[in-house]
Amino acid sequence: MPTLRSLLAGLWLLASGLLVSTTALAAEDDRPVVNDSGVAPEKPAAGTLPTLWIAGDSTVKSNAPMRGWGQDLGQFFDPKKINVVNHAIGGRSSRTFYTEGRWQKLLDGVKPGDWVIIQFGHNDVGATGASSKFRGSVKGIGDNTETVTKEDGKTEVVQSYGWYLKTMARTARAKGANVILCSPIPHKKFDSAGKPARDWSDFRGWVQTCAKETGAYYVDLCELIARDYDKLKQPEIEAMFADKGTHTNDAGSRFNARALVAG
C-alpha cells in the first residue's frame, strides 16, 4: 500500500495549483438528528475536468452551525484544474447513503481518472432497527446480514458496514476512478490526563481491510486529526465543535480538511 504522502502527492498532481498552504461510543443513540433530505447533490462546475467526489455523512457535509470537512476541501485545489464535488449528506450511514440511491447518483457522474473519497461510520454505529432510526449497518465487514421490518411494514435485508464500503469502492473503481476510504473523524473525547482520546478502533481496522480487499487507498483520518489535536490544549479542541462531541463548526471543518490534505 502506498504511503499517505505519496497518495496525497497524487492528489496534488491533479491540482498542482494548490491555493492554500498546509501546515468509547455512547451505548444509546443520543446524537442529534441531522436530516438534509432536501439538499440536492452538487454537480461538477466543469464537466471536462477531473473530479474529486466526496461521499459521507454530516461530519463531511452539514449546515451551519455545524460544518463538515468536505465543505472546505475544495479551497486546497485549483478549480481550473479539478472539480471538487461534495455529495455527503447529514444523517446518512453507509447503508442509507447506498439504499436511498445517493451512491448511484454519485457513481453516474464518475469518469475514468476521477477520485472518490468515502467516509462513513458515525451513523453506522447504532442498531439496524427503529431505535437508531433504521440507519445502523451490521457490524463488521463480512457477508452477515440482518432483516428488519420498517415502519411501513416492508422488510429490508441490512448488509454489513464493510459490504457497503466495498460495494462503493468496487463500483467506482470499475468506472476507472481512484478510491480513498477514510476512517471516521474523531469525537471530542479526552483521556484522564486531558489528552485527545483515540476512538473508532474497530471501524478503523474495518476500513483499512476494505481498502486492501478492493484496491482502494486507505487514509486513517481519525489518527491524522487526533495527531494534530495532540498539539492543542483541550479548550482549543472544544472550540472547534458545534455540539456535544460529534459535529465540528467552521473552524473545525477547516482544521480537518487541512489535516487530510497535509497528511
Residue spans of the language-model regions?
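N-terminal secretory signal peptides that target proteins for export/translocation
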Residues: M1-L4
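Serine-esterase "nucleophile elbow" of acetyl-processing enzymes
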Residues: A27-G90, Q104-V116, S132-G140
